Amino acid sequence: MKQKTTTFKSGFVSIIGRPNVGKSTLLNRVIGQKIAIMSDKPQTTRNKVQGVLTRDDAQLVFMDTPGIHKPKHRLGDFMMKVAKNTLREVDLILYVVEADAKFGPGEQYIIERLQETKTPVFLLINKIDKVSPEELLKVIDLYKDRYPFAEIIPISALEGNNVPTLVEQIVEHMEEGPQYYPADQVTDHPERFIIAELIREKVLHLTKEEIPHSVAVVIEQIKKRDNGKVYVGATVIVERSSQKGIIIGKHGAMLKEVGQLARSDIEALLGSSVYLELWVKVQKDWRNRPSQLKDYGFNENEY
């Protein structure tokens, strides 16, 4: 009879990559719950969301960092600081690239950042369904020549292909360590943060190109009512009056749809019925104002 191992492994893992390569999709696939905002627009991940995967033999704490890019405003500066700080404090880096994307200056910039750290790096080639096996081999060779990756693993974060293999490889790479979080905890962010992110995800998804990333969501109140329902009051912050009009929509239709979709996710998160009330407020140029960035939850000292 095979003796069960008593060794428990743990460690911190950072997920990095250019904007919109599937980092949040991967994190949510690994954890099994929606905790990192997903959108088809770049720069949707702003704060360093932590996802925690606990098994009988290991605990992995994942960091989902903003896409690495050249900052264009103070919010961009904040996002880049978060990404760079994360690389210094983890045991393993997962660098996600798209199988069908060309290697350009953005990829070169990230590899140069990786060369500044001694942390082991796994290269994850995502969206493998979009290329042929021959094309995939060319992508592997291309990256092999540029950096000594500890592992190169082709995956499909959306479909889940090869993700279990990836998790096993990560655990194998970790050293013996303590359990940092309770077994039933999947993130260290408070519920208010996750609820705000779920609402923001719906705004970005429904408004498509009309609303850029000048959107923040502030949770004003969360309160359990006598009837058992949870009341959530939230304000969507935009930079221009025209954006406010788009989010509210004709006769309030857009805001209503945002609310319905967000409420469904919030109910799944909280495990109870939710009454969601939304307001929209204009705060001009908030992304360049440090005091407002702090008010809306972007505090670089915490990261």
From Swiss-Prot:
NCBIfam families per the UniProt record, alphabetical: era (TIGR00436), PRK00089.1 (NF000908), small_GTP (TIGR00231)
Annotated region (G5), positions in chain: 155-157
Record note on quaternary structure: Monomer.
Keywords, sorted A to Z: Cell membrane, Cytoplasm, GTP-binding, Membrane, Nucleotide-binding, Ribosome biogenesis, RNA-binding, rRNA-binding
Domain of life: Bacteria
Residue numbers spanned by region G4: 126-129
Region spans: G3: 64-67
UniProt region (G2), positions on chain: 43-47
Similarity section: Belongs to the TRAFAC class TrmE-Era-EngA-EngB-Septin-like GTPase superfamily. Era GTPase family.
Signal sequence segment: none
Subcellular location: Cytoplasm; Cell membrane
Pfam families: KH_2, MMR_HSR1
UniProt keyword S-adenosyl-L-methionine, yes or no: no
Protein role: An essential GTPase that binds both GDP and GTP, with rapid nucleotide exchange. Plays a role in 16S rRNA processing and 30S ribosomal subunit biogenesis and possibly also in cell cycle regulation and energy metabolism.
GO cellular component, one term: cytosol
KH type-2 domain ranges (all copies): 199-284
Sequence ranges assigned to domain Era-type G in this UniProt record: 9-176
Region (G1): 17-24
Annotated GO biological process: ribosomal small subunit assembly
Example GO molecular function: GTP binding
Name of this chain's protein: GTPase Era
